[in-house]
Design a protein with these regions (language model features):
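Short, well-ordered alpha-helix to beta-strand connector turns
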Residues: 40, 63, 80-81
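Conserved catalytic-core segment of nucleotide-activated headgroup transferases in glycan assembly
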Residues: 1-30
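Nucleotide-sugar-dependent
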Residues: 47-55, 71, 75-76
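Acidic donor-binding loop of glycosyltransferase active sites
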Residues: 35-51
Length: 157
């Protein structure tokens, strides 16, 4: 519903931009999603509940800048140099319109693109994340098993 309200507000306030569309990328396969997002000139993120924010990171990874609402729990990767992050949802349509005008005039700072790339390059890949998660859980389970064996040994003595 937030998305629909944003789109309606945007088109009502800025009818000159009715020629471009907002795309809902939910429900797409991973490949379709990656292709669709790479065709955008900006991504809009309005999820206040998401604590990590994979959507903005995926956008940054393919070189698409993000305008977003700062979530309740701000991810550690989020900073003022790698996207346009705002707290006041009411300003979102104005900021999208300003961004669009700057984009049309080829007036977007290359520094933002550089900062986006640096942000995603610092983060682990999906495979690295999965391997680290497996490693941590394996270590945890081994420690738990060792602790249980020690307790059983004490009980049997």
């Amino acid at each position: 519903e937030d998305t629909i309200n944003l789109i309606k507000t945007f088109y009502l306030r800025f009818p000159q931009y009715r020629w471009f569309t907002f795309r809902d990328l939910r429900g797409l396969s991973q490949e379709e999603f990656a292709n669709a997002i790479s065709e955008c000139f900006v991504s809009v993120w309005i999820d206040r509940q998401s604590a990590y924010g994979t959507f903005p990171l995926e956008s940054m990874k393919v070189g698409v800048p993000v305008i977003g609402i700062t979530p309740n729990l701000v991810p550690e990767w989020m900073n003022e140099n790698n996207g346009i992050w705002i707290k006041d949802e009411i300003l979102l349509s104005d900021i999208i319109a300003d961004w669009t005008q700057n984009w049309l005039e080829d007036n977007i700072s290359e520094e933002m693109y550089t900062n986006m790339k640096e942000t995603v390059d610092k983060l682990p890949t999906k495979e690295q994340f999965e391997n680290k998660t497996i490693e941590l859980f394996t270590e945890y389970l081994e420690l738990r098993a060792q602790s249980m064996e020690e307790q059983i040994s004490k009980f049997n003595d």
